Structure formats: structure tokens, C-alpha cells
Amino acid sequence: MQYMTIVAFLAATVAAGPQIRAYPSIDQITVAQANNACGNNMQVTCCNKVTNTPAGNAVGNGAGILNNLSLFDQCSKLDVNVLAIANGLLNKECQANAACCQNSGGSATGGLVNVALPCIALSSLI
């Protein structure tokens, strides 16, 4: 009886463990793999400008909350529908900074807290 309890416990532990994505490094990933890493509602983009400064708030200069956040600008969408690009390496198609951006615009105005963070660095998702 104890054997079955141990086997059931180990099976439950393995099933509840985090899912590990088997993506290669950012230098070896294809555009299709990058598109899969971005998921549904996001698209692979190539951004020319990245700002790595923390955003300020009422508690000091960011208080360490957003220190690892990068803001992307001057981004252009990579077309994944073209077969030649989908099979090519991402670093050949995007010489700048690859990011996953939301399909909606990154505009946030007129609210109490105006935050528009539509892009996430691809390297943080793989």
C-alpha cells in the first residue's frame, strides 16, 4: 500500500511541475519558433530603440519595482506568413532587438494611471 502511495505522490509531483519550453538560444531560434513563444494576441517585431531605465513613481525613483522592464520603440512587424522567413533564423531577419508586441496599439491616455506596455523582450520569454 505504501508503494502505491509513493508512486501516486511522485506522479502528482511531476504533473504539477513547471512546463519547460524547449526553445534554443535567442541566436538559434527561427521566426516560427519566436512566433510560437509570443503566443496568441502577440506578434514578433523587430525594435530599433530600447529604453532600459526604471519608471519613476511616488515612492522614490521606481523603488526597484520596474527595474527589469524594457520599453521598446520604433518597432516593425516580422511577416511570419512567408515560408522563407518562417524557416530562417530570427537573427538574420532582425538585426536589432526582437520583441513580442500586442496586436493593439500601445496608447494609454486620459486615465488616472496611464501605462502602455505593449511589448515584451523575446529573450525573457524563451
Swiss-Prot record:
Induction summary: Expression is positively regulated by the cAMP-protein kinase A (PKA) pathway and more specifically by the adenylate cyclase FAC1. In contrast, deletion of PKA catalytitic subunit CPK1 has no obvious effect on the expression of HYD1.
Location of this chain's protein in the cell: Secreted; Secreted, Cell wall
InterPro entries the UniProt entry points to: Hydrophobin
Coiled coil is among the record's keywords: no
Effect of disrupting the coding gene: Does not affect pathogenicity in a corn seedling infection assay nor the production of microconidia, but affects microconidial chain formation.
Main location: secreted
GO CC term, one of those recorded: fungal-type cell wall
Homology family: Belongs to the fungal hydrophobin family.
Known function: Aerial growth, conidiation, and dispersal of filamentous fungi in the environment rely upon a capability of their secreting small amphipathic proteins called hydrophobins (HPBs) with low sequence identity. Class I can self-assemble into an outermost layer of rodlet bundles on aerial cell surfaces, conferring cellular hydrophobicity that supports fungal growth, development and dispersal; whereas Class II form highly ordered films at water-air interfaces through intermolecular interactions but contribute nothing to the rodlet structure.
Record's protein name: Class I hydrophobin 1
Organism: Gibberella moniliformis
